[in-house]
Amino acid sequence: MKTIISFFLGCLLACMQLPAQVLEDGFTQSEITDAIFTQIKGKSFKDNCTTPRADLRYLKVLHYNKDGEVLEGEMICHKSIANDLLAIFQELYKAKYPIERMKLVDEYEADDGASMRANNSSAFNFRYISGTKSLSRHSRGMAVDINPLYNPYVRYRGGRTLVEPVNAKPYVDRSKDFPYKIVKGDLCYRLFKKYGFLWGGDWKNSKDYQHFEKY
């Protein structure tokens, strides 16, 4: 009888521990393998890339979309923030915080505009800040864009409003309610701030609601 009871108790404990194991298995980091490097070389990892391959990490995570579906996501970032991002995405996953899409920007030929238009969340991409000759923090894998279509980059110049991506104009008015919107104080904002990231929505001369970066 004791053996039977012990068996069922063991099964019960295993079942209770299963969600944590699944959660742990769904969130991993690794060095950039040859297969991944072949995928990004000449795209996000351009020929003039100054960030060493050894400084980058490939992340695999789980995330929900607004319809409650669980999706597999992937992202490349700098090794110094890999653990931070895994912790952040684990917490977002536990809370069922919606992220529509998370694929390597290379699936869009490293075209930031195309990736944003598809509402693709991403990190590493060796490129310049839009409209400047300065390298973006994305070039080092030290910045992350979350749900970029619904959280656009907005700049006002000479009476004109510049919005990126170009199809994000309906989401410039942050008083409106719509899915995937990041607002100051929400879970996504709080988690990134907890791990020392700065939010583009706090900028004064422009707003980049999708953007979190770390120094």
Predicted regions mapped to residue ranges:
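Second-shell loop/turn segments in exported
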Residues: 70-79, 132, 173-180
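Extracellular/periplasmic catalytic domains that process cell-envelope and extracellular macromolecules
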Residues: 52-55, 135-141, 191
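N-terminal module-boundary/linker segments of secreted carbohydrate-active enzymes
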Residues: 21-69
